[in-house]
Amino acid sequence: DEQTGSKGPNENLPSQKDLXAKASXLTEV
């Protein structure tokens, strides 16, 4: 699953995803 990006990319995305989600507000993923 690490190759599929279940832990690697996901761990690096949380920061951008959270910011985006908070900035959008509409997209709470």
UniProtKB/Swiss-Prot annotation:
Q: Which GO terms describe its molecular function?
A: toxin activity
| Highest taxon, organism lineage | Eukaryota
Q: What ranges does the record give for the region Disordered, renumbered to this chain?
A: 1-29
Q: Enumerate the subcellular locations listed in this protein's record, separating them with semicolons.
A: Secreted; Nematocyst; Target cell membrane
Q: Which GO terms describe its biological process?
A: killing of cells of another organism; monoatomic ion transport
GO cellular component entries: extracellular region; membrane; nematocyst; other organism cell membrane
Keyword Lipid metabolism annotated: no
This chain's function reads: Pore-forming toxin that lyses bovine erythrocytes at nanomolar concentrations. Is devoid of enzymatic activity. Binds to monolayers and efficiently permeabilizes small lipid vesicles composed of sphingomyelin and cholesterol. The cytolytic activity is not prevented by cholesterol or sphingomyelin.
Name of the featured protein: Cytolysin Uc-1
User: Which organism was this protein described from?
Assistant: Urticina crassicornis (Mottled anemone)
